Amino acid sequence: MINIEDISKSSNQSEEKQLKSTSSKPKYSFAAKSLFKGSNNITPYYLSTSNTFQCVASESIQTWLLSDDGHIFTSSGNFVLDVSSGGYFVELVQLNSNSKTQIWTIDTTNNKIQNQGNGKYLDIDNLNIYVAPLNGNATQQWTTFRRAPIPTGNWGYFQSKQLDSNNNYWGLSVLNNSTSYNTSVVMNKVQAKSIKRWSHFITFGGNLVLDIGPSINGSKTYYLNTNVYKANDLMQQWGINENNQIFNQYYPNLCIGFVGELGVDSTVNCVLAQPSSACDINFQWIANPTYSLNQIVSEVPEQFPAYTSGDLLASYQYLSDDATNGYTDDIRSLYTSINVSLENFYVNVTNATCPSSIHQLKIFQNQIKNELTYAINVRLVFDNYSGFYSKLFSQGSTNLTNLANLINVDMSSDQVVNGNYTDAITSVFYAIISEIPIGGSIIANIGESAEEFGELDAESNDSGPSTYQVTLSKLYDHLNENYENEMANAQRMKNTILQDWGMMSKTFTLCFLPTNNPSSLNMNGFDFQKISSIASLAYLTAMIQMLLPTNYQIYFTPAGYYAPVSSDDYSYTDSTGTYIMAEIDNCNSHPPKALTDKLWKNGVSKQEVFTSSYGWNLATSVTYYNMVGKYGGMFKLSFPTVKNITSVPMQFVMTNGSDRVGTFNVKTHFAGLASTYYNSGALGHHYYDIAVTDIDRNKVANFTVDNNLEALEGSYVSIKTNSLVVQPGYVVGNPTCNQGSFSQGFAASILIPIYKSN
């Protein structure tokens, strides 16, 4: 039985079990959303595979895949929607291509979902889904859409719809940029490099989350503060409803707002309280970037006004022929053509005269002029984006060669490099927003929407991240292919908009919003030179992130032991110990200053680089310099680093045979190093096990590390063949494996990245 889910509930449940994959290929994803609302008239309900809810409608349990032949699949593709044997309730089963009750018709005109087996319609009965004859009730009305994602990963923030008296935007932030728990959540002005904005309600510290603070004078209004992550705590779980209100799962009728006057009071505290109405602007928030374009192209198509017969067709054909100087009698077919001037067409339409045989030319003139105006502005937006993107990659080959020389890698070799294209381009958009928050989100809006559009438009429905493993000799070709794909995605998205009246109208509206509105596509007054400079530096950093692990790793010495540091250019020290960057096979050969200057002089965080946080993925070796005894055998060992590239805090347990080496926490977008010394055997293969769970103790992945010691050599390290088991919803990327050194006495290192599948 399938349920309608109230967004006041929460769960970590997903499909109960994985069955054999179906063979029918999904076409696109959508979420079926009922127009029926809860008793508070704020909370919407969604079609869901679970009897509880997970924060927002884009979660996997509420995302569905519609195949060309009318099957409705769960997001994983393992189950289809069917009518139960009793002919009343709806259930999830395996695909049966001969069953008509598994085939549905989505009527976007009347907002109905009809079963082809019995002719009945999807309906609601006490929050359960069933099928019933057509009855005209609102409970049979559904809107199909694909909600644009809210910011994920290590970027994005939430800003209030309320402006101050000087039209400045303000967003959720942490008092004094504190990284300590139990700190007040306040409003801060949206400005460049304000890094303590909230992202997915997990701070940049990794495990601090938004929580409910004390009540204000014993009322039902509460302060908000930061706190450590607590498993299954509904007070730390949040959702966004259709009114752009951020509600709490424990108090579903209470939403985040603020008390005080923006720009006047020295501190404006954020609170959890009851909105005065669904339109209370002090309780409405915008996720920046908004991906408003992604949302537009996900909506139900809306055709242009039809002129298909009689006088209507004759008038349209005459005007088209006149405007295009006889080129075509269907002017709309040229909206996507790059070889025509829509501006000239507009002039011709405006100056067109009406012969006696044409009776309704004026009506057509106004409609086609509007269409041309919309199309001209939409094309201009995408032309500006294409110009920015082309310039960003115009020096790609030269820049890559120069970096390779600094990092000392041979670009003609067959050495393998790991990369993630999405991470690279996302870092560019994040840099632009960080430096130019007012307006910078426009570039991110287009770029991220184009990327999402391309993924959904692809023939395959791959759920993994955009990671790749390629030889250095083929790296540039691979990057160039990614660049061309991104340009093609933007082009296809533009053409989709230009061929749809509803999408084109809505996109045109965004072109004239104020630039400080995150949904805006208004590029008037843009400083593209500044944007390009910021983007170029960000992309350069992304290329360094990709190439650096091919020749360098981090050498970690725990606090209290000697570490030979002679320059801050290649070292970092904190309370846990000293981190030194050096070549993989020589711990005494450090990166040149010309390379490190490209990092530290461009604002890159040393902590992030040396601890492999966010976009940095350097494997870490453990070494005890000039030590004897057990530490002198460090070369026999290998030490794992688990990189958590998700928004879910994790931990992993390392066991060496019957010995439990330790439990290690891994914050979101951080890396966790198992630096605890353990016993190793003699020559040959030795194994230790890694079990990764999320902070709620749900399994993520299990694997065995093979630590192979040969005579007078440092250990070779790898993941044991066939040992990797990954839970649904996660992907384990290509590990970075570096050999230890017998002569220099350092351990082997292995970094294992874990992603959330899309």
Swiss-Prot record:
Keywords: Cytoplasm, Lectin, Membrane, Repeat. It is found in: Cytoplasm; Membrane. It is a peripheral membrane protein. Residues 1-22 are annotated as: Disordered. GO terms for cellular component: cytoplasm; membrane; nucleus. GO terms for biological process: response to cation stress. Residues 25-145, 156-288 form the Ricin B-type lectin domain. The keyword Protein biosynthesis does not apply. Gene3D superfamilies: 2.80.10.50. It holds the Pfam family Ricin_B_lectin. Induction: Induced by high levels of extracellular Ca(2+). One of its GO terms (molecular function) is carbohydrate binding. The keyword Repeat applies. May play an important role in stabilizing and/or regulating the cell membrane during Ca(2+) stress or certain stages of development. Belongs to the cup family. This is Calcium up-regulated protein E. It comes from Dictyostelium discoideum. The lineage of its organism: Eukaryota, Amoebozoa, Evosea, Eumycetozoa, Dictyostelia. The gene is cupE.
